[in-house]
Amino acid sequence: MPRVRIAVGCHPHNAKFYDDGLEADLRRMLKDPRVAALGEIGLDYHYDFSPRDDQREAFRRQLRLAKEAGLPVVLHLREAHDEALAIMREEGFPEAGTLLHCFNLDWATLEPWVEEGCYVAFGGALTFKNADDTREAAARVPADRLLTETDAPYMTPEPMRGMTCLPDHVLFTAE
């Protein structure tokens, strides 16, 4: 499958396992030409499956790796957008780009990220009845920075909600 590309990284849920050995494995994987990005990386303060200090450290180290490798990052952020933005500004945004994965908040949260030139992906949550703020945010993202995604098997869009999300459901989100 020559057109398939992958992203590799240590998700914030697993940040407690990030160590020099894991980083060495990532460095090795980043040399594979099929790797297109480093991700999902970031901060998830909703579940706190890993201690926040571990999440911050893994996030910073992986940002540095992405910049060294000249690769974009795919960010998983939950209840931590302001802190993640501060870290990104301290560490520097990768020249290759930054993608906010599955954004589902409001324009006030998103605007500084867009000002930094980030790409923004919206998943099925964009179609939920209570997502007016997210739809407004999506409408304000420049077209050249706007993406849709499924986050399958999660966040199934209307009208398929309640079922397992599948890749072809991205059409409902895009509409």
Segment roles from a protein language model:
Residues 1-175:
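Mid-domain alpha/beta scaffold segments of enzyme catalytic cores
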